[in-house]
Curated annotation (Swiss-Prot):
<feature type="transmembrane region" description="Helical">
    <location>
        <begin position="481"/>
        <end position="501"/>
    </location>
</feature>
<keyword id="KW-0813">Transport</keyword>
<keyword id="KW-0633">Potassium transport</keyword>
<feature type="transmembrane region" description="Helical">
    <location>
        <begin position="446"/>
        <end position="466"/>
    </location>
</feature>
<dbReference type="GO" id="GO:0006813">
    <property type="term" value="P:potassium ion transport"/>
</dbReference>
<dbReference type="GO" id="GO:0009706">
    <property type="term" value="C:chloroplast inner membrane"/>
</dbReference>
<keyword id="KW-1001">Plastid inner membrane</keyword>
<dbReference type="Pfam" id="PF03040">
    <property type="entry name" value="CemA"/>
</dbReference>
<comment type="similarity">
    <text>Belongs to the CemA family.</text>
</comment>
<feature type="transmembrane region" description="Helical">
    <location>
        <begin position="294"/>
        <end position="314"/>
    </location>
</feature>
<keyword id="KW-0150">Chloroplast</keyword>
<keyword id="KW-0375">Hydrogen ion transport</keyword>
<keyword id="KW-0934">Plastid</keyword>
<keyword id="KW-0050">Antiport</keyword>
<protein>
    <recommendedName>
        <fullName>Potassium/proton antiporter CemA</fullName>
    </recommendedName>
</protein>
<keyword id="KW-1133">Transmembrane helix</keyword>
<dbReference type="GO" id="GO:0015297">
    <property type="term" value="F:antiporter activity"/>
</dbReference>
Length: 521
């Protein structure tokens, strides 16, 4: 019985999917209306807002608008798909029965399609239909007996007649002893009222989307991209109208660095807002903007890390590796990928021969010198085959690593190019997070980074890094190249970093520079 109840709950949840998805889409359409109203209210505050604040408002509202539009379209697609599947189930037929009863008498079936696709009849189906037997566990639950013409059905006929249903010629069982069972989680009146409400919601959603298209057309908004311009003057739209897209100037979402520190301009802007009495209306906006910046930055950073790994790892294992093995072992006759591998293999083979020859000399016997010579040749031959197989696999792995690295770096590069606005938001969030720290914490992180990369203890770490990278790419370990790199790169990095401290950090926050020098000493 528990198993049957479980399947009935699943069936009932699935039958409520159209109503649930339409309600979700309707709620998203209401949020779209609120966003449009918020845009009008924020537009009145434009003269008192700095330029970067207005641009951030537009970017934030456009992102929320795109999210709600996506929810609407996804919910409508879910609604249509569930209705289509319910119609398929209806064509197969649903039987209503009671445990222990035979499948000999006609039973009453509510046609699901009549609720979702405009079919205007209730259908009487015989239980002798063999395609209905498999639905027995779904139909024996929540059934209630009715005799002949049920009262629920009599009152339902009025609703059906109002909607154009013809219920006069309906035939019912004439045997009073024969029972008919009506399966439905709700009564027919409730179902029809629910369908009417769902139709009203779908009509509201359609009207909202049409109005949104006109609104975006008027303000030259696109569904998934937005070009931000200068702050509009009074009586002028903040978004350029169609035909004026050439005059739009694309800007970034964070404050640019100028001669005057940003803290001073931000303080003056807040003081002006307090004087005009409009500070309370910006509290909610600032909270939403900070939340949006943090979530968007973390999502973008997670995508930059996880998506390249998620694509390169399956590609390396199931696509690239079999293809490279087949191509290298069949179409290529060489074993070594470059001269360095061949030189390493020759040295390794020479070492193996010397060791085997030394073992034979130590165990030499004058009576069996010819047999020992044959054994030595056979051992050298076996070791040579092992080395060839090992370096052949090494060549395959080198090619595989090279292609995987190209994929791993190509995907973030494409993300940087296509997601410039997301990158600008993440840049703004990182800068704001860094500048919100205390001077001591800022100096600590700067000192930790510089000592890790260009400190006195870093040359050994650079040697390990360069040797691992050269081995990964199939090159030999060259001490001269590594020493040259370690002796020049940290010096250049230290020079660039000191120039950045002198040029940028000393102008933004002199206290950080003083704290940094004090900690460094």
């Amino acid at each position: 019985m528990k198993f049957k109840l479980y399947w009935w709950e699943v069936f009932r949840w699935f039958s409520d999917t159209p109503s649930r998805s339409s309600e979700r889409a309707c709620e998203a359409s209401r949020q779209v209306q609120h966003i449009k109203k918020d845009y009008v209210s924020y537009k009145c505050l434009v003269p008192s807002l700095p330029k970067h604040s207005w641009q951030a408002i537009i970017l934030y509202m456009n992102t929320r608008l795109n999210n709600f539009v996506f929810i609407i379209y996804w919910s409508v697609l879910e609604c249509k798909t569930s209705i289509y599947l319910l119609n398929i189930l209806n064509k197969l037929g649903l039987i209503v029965s009671v445990p222990g009863k035979s499948f000999s008498s006609p039973k009453l079936l509510i046609n699901i399609r009549s609720f979702f696709n405009g079919n205007k009849r209730l259908r009487i189906m015989s239980q002798s239909n063999p395609y209905n037997i498999w639905l027995y566990p779904l139909n024996i639950l929540l059934s209630f007996p009715v005799h002949r013409k049920p009262k629920k059905l009599r009152s339902t006929e009025k609703i059906f007649e109002k909607n154009g249903f013809n219920c006069e010629n309906r035939e019912y069982p004439h045997d009073k002893n024969d029972k008919t069972y009506f399966v439905s989680g709700k009564s027919s009146e409730e179902e029809l009222v629910r369908i009417e409400r769902m139709n009203q919601k779908l009509a509201w959603i359609e009207a909202t989307l049409n109005d949104l298209d006109n609104w975006k057309r008027y303000y030259s908004l696109s569904s998934f991209s937005f070009e931000m311009g200068d702050i509009p003057e009074e009586g002028q739209s903040s978004l350029s109208v169609e035909g004026e897209s050439d005059s739009i100037v694309t800007t970034i979402a964070y404050e640019s660095i100028g001669l005057v520190p940003r803290s001073i301009t931000r303080t003056l802007s807040r003081f002006k807002t307090e004087l005009t009495g409009q500070s309370s209306s910006l509290v909610l906006y600032e909270f939403r903007l900070a939340k949006y910046q943090a979530l968007a930055s973390l999502q973008y950073l997670g995508c930059l890390i996880l998506i390249p790994w998620g694509i390169s790892f399956p590609s390396e294992r199931w696509l690239l590796k079999p293809w490279i093995k087949n191509w290298w072992n069949i179409n290529q006759f060489q074993i070594f990928l470059n001269y360095f591998q061949e030189e390493r293999a020759s040295k390794r083979l020479q070492e193996v021969e010397e060791l085997l020859w030394l073992d034979e000399v130590m165990l030499a016997d004058s009576s069996s010198s010819e047999v020992q010579s044959q054994d030595l040749n056979r051992q050298i031959h076996d070791k040579t085959i092992q080395l060839v197989a090992m370096y052949n696999e090494d060549s395959i792995q080198t090619i595989l690593h090279l292609l995987t690295d190209i994929i791993y770096f190509a995907i973030p590069s494409a993300s940087f190019i296509s997601g410039k606005k997301r990158l600008a938001v993440m840049n703004s969030w990182i800068q704001e997070s860094f500048h919100s720290l205390s001077d001591t914490m800022k100096a600590f992180f700067i000192l930790l980074l510089t000592d890790s990369c260009i400190g006195f203890h870093s040359p050994h770490g650079w040697e390990i890094l360069i040797s691992s990278l050269s081995k990964h790419l199939g090159f030999a370990h060259n001490k001269h190249i590594i020493s040259c790199f370690v002796s020049t790169f940290p010096v250049i990095s230290d020079t660039v970093f000191k120039y950045w401290i002198f040029r940028h950090l000393n102008r933004i926050s002199p206290s950080i520079v003083a704290t940094y020098h004090a900690m460094n000493e």
